[in-house]
Amino acid sequence: MHVGIFADGGYEKGMGHVVRMKRLAEGLKQRCLITFYTNQDSEAFLHEEHWQVIVKPELQQHEFILREIKSKKLDLLLFDILGAPAELLKKIKTETDAKIVLFEEKNGKSIQYSDAVINGIYGDIRSRVYVQGNTRIYEGPDYLILHPAFQAAREDYTLKKDCRNILVALGGSDPKQLIFKVLAAADQVPDIKDKNMMFVMGSASPHQEAVRRRIEKKPQYKMIEQTNDMAGLMKQADAAIVAGGISLYEAICIGVPCLVLSQVEHQTATAKTFADQGAALDLGLGELVPDETLIYQMSRIMSSYPLRLSLHKGGRPLVDGKGIIRVTAILQDLYEQEI
């Protein structure tokens, strides 16, 4: 089986798409050939000896992709991009035998030309499977692709009564620069000098040097540049401040009580859904949150063990961390239908 994976990332787009597909590729690499098609900003992040990475041209991308599918005889195509182009998918369906799987896609025109859709984030909080036309759709956290280490961390995690370690993870690129908002608020939180704060910054963030200067005289603060062990870092945390993307799901999977500052509008829906289930504290779009509100809510989650315990218990049943196993099985079954 030869799998083609299409995913882009960068400062404006964020890194969620390429992170998700890289994780999935790690789970698939022993059973198939893999070729990534990405943009210039993501090439270095995706580089790995187990697969090929090809940077798509800026012009005539659709024609290039069709040629690649035909010349490499790709069997399975995974699209994790913002708005998979229906026109291209239609041509692929007409001119090739490749199976098409879309990730986090809600556009009905695109969905009609796919064989399966995996909506781990866009789906409801309660997972389900249904058929739309000729397409099978898998929705909800059961199909969320997390690194296998999160399942192990979930089993090892114990919530402590004393909140000493706080993790801050605001996305791979933090386009709204929310980390500076959190740093300013932290200065006003009572007893913050007794807390250890870990600021995790992704490879696409341009703010690393500015953050390093900001915290250099605060020994209890630590900046972590691009980690391959987010599960290990989260397992150390007694509370977390996260964006409404993949870091939110990671924290909930392990059981880390979290405060959510969404980077973009679609993240607010996810955060609100979890908050309604008692699984997170949702403050909405981070750039719109008043400083006083952020200071108050940070103080609250750090000081109240009953609140953290309630969030811990409310979230853990919702994300079990086994999504990558389920998705890998779905892809294998889809491929074998044609054999």
Swiss-Prot record:
GO terms for molecular function: glycosyltransferase activity; hexosyltransferase activity. It is found in: Cell membrane. Coiled coil: none annotated. Pathway: Spore coat biogenesis; spore coat polysaccharide biosynthesis. Pfam families: Glyco_tran_28_C (PF04101). The keyword Heme does not apply. Keywords: Cell membrane, Membrane, Transmembrane, Transmembrane helix. The keyword Transmembrane helix applies. It comes from the Bacteria. InterPro entries: Glyco_trans_28_C. This is Spore coat polysaccharide biosynthesis protein SpsG. It comes from Bacillus subtilis (strain 168).
